[in-house]
Structures are given as structure tokens and as C-alpha cells.
């Protein structure tokens, strides 16, 4: 598999938009890419470089035909004030009934994530807690998983 990933024909990247500086999907329809490659990874949306996000009503945009969803949560936002760690903090606070200046606890983040996943009917989505190496309190990952009520992949992806 590692050799296949290094092969030029087995990986694609999006097209850089010179006006926005953002990557967009390639010209080929995703269905065609899915027929040509074993895996097609799509970032559904961004979070303005913040570790946590409350999604707007139209997000995330999930392409039709998606087989698996991995919802990534930035652990570096746990234990920080919501107004510093969350993209769209007002929506986040609306969903968990708290103030902007309170701490983004594992329980609050799980409450918001559960509400969003339920609204999108994503009961089979997997959840990855990334950046666990940044946690000052390692029990936060366990608390997040317990509050979420489903298994969580806790990791620190580098690079």
C-alpha cells in the first residue's frame, strides 16, 4: 500500500484557486475518480484554522455517493475558551447553551457534535480526535469519547 501511495498515478490533489488560495475539487467528477482509485479523500469544509467548529445549516457539504465519513475534531481546542478555539462560536454556544467565554470542555464539544451528526443523520460516521499530543490533561480524550457515546479514534497526525 505504501508503495502504491507513492506512485504518481495513485494520488490526486485539488486545483488551487489563484483568487482565493483555496483548493477546490479536480475537474473530474468524483464518481469517475472513485472508479479509478481505491480511496478518494475529500475535505468537506474548513474551520478558519481553528481546532473546533460549529457547522452552518448547509455544512458539511458531503458529496453524493460518499461511502465513509470521518469527522475530525481538533483536541487542541479542548480546555480553551470557546471564543478562541471554535469557528462560529455563537452557533456552538447556541447548540450547547453556554456563553462564548466558557471553556470548550470535552462534554460540550461532544454535545454539539452529537447534535450536528444527528441532524445530518450520520449515525455511521467515525470520529477522530486529532492532536491528542497537545492535551494537558490526557483524560480529556476519554471524557470526549464517553460523552459522545461512540468509539473515538484518538491520534496525532503529523505533517
Task: Provide a role label for each language-model segment.
Residues 131, 158-159:
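Long, charged alpha-helical interface segments
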Residues 8-11, 36-40, 68:
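Loop/turn-to-beta-strand initiation segments
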Residues 20-36, 45-151:
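Conserved catalytic-core segment of NTP-binding enzymes
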Residues 1-20:
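N-terminal phosphate/diphosphate-binding loop that engages ATP/GTP or pyrophosphate donors
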Residues 1-5, 39, 46:
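Short intrinsically disordered, low-complexity coil segments enriched in acidic
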Residues 2, 44, 141, 155-156:
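Small-side-chain structural scaffolding
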Residues 5-9, 145-154:
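Structural recognition of alpha->loop->beta junctions
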Residues 12-15, 40-44, 153-155:
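General beta-strand structural signal in soluble alpha/beta enzymes
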Amino acid at each position: 500500500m505504501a508503495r502504491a501511495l507513492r506512485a504518481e498515478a495513485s494520488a490526486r490533489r485539488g486545483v488551487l484557486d489563484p483568487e482565493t488560495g483555496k483548493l477546490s475539487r479536480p475537474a473530474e467528477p468524483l464518481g469517475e475518480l472513485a472508479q479509478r482509485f481505491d480511496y478518494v479523500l475529500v475535505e468537506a469544509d474548513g474551520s478558519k484554522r481553528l481546532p473546533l467548529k460549529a457547522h452552518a445549516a448547509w455544512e458539511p457539504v458531503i458529496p453524493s455517493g460518499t461511502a465513509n465519513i470521518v469527522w475530525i475534531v481538533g483536541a487542541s481546542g479542548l480546555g480553551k475558551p470557546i471564543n478562541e478555539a471554535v469557528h462560529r462560536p455563537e452557533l456552538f454556544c447556541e447548540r450547547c447553551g453556554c456563553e462564548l467565554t466558557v471553556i470548550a470542555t470535552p462534554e460540550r464539544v461532544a454535545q454539539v457534535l452529537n447534535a450536528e451528526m444527528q441532524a445530518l443523520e450520520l449515525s455511521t460516521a467515525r470520529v477522530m480526535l486529532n492532536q491528542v499530543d497537545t492535551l494537558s490533561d490526557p483524560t480529556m480524550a476519554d471524557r470526549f469519547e464517553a460523552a459522545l457515546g461512540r468509539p473515538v479514534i484518538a491520534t496525532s497526525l503529523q505533517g
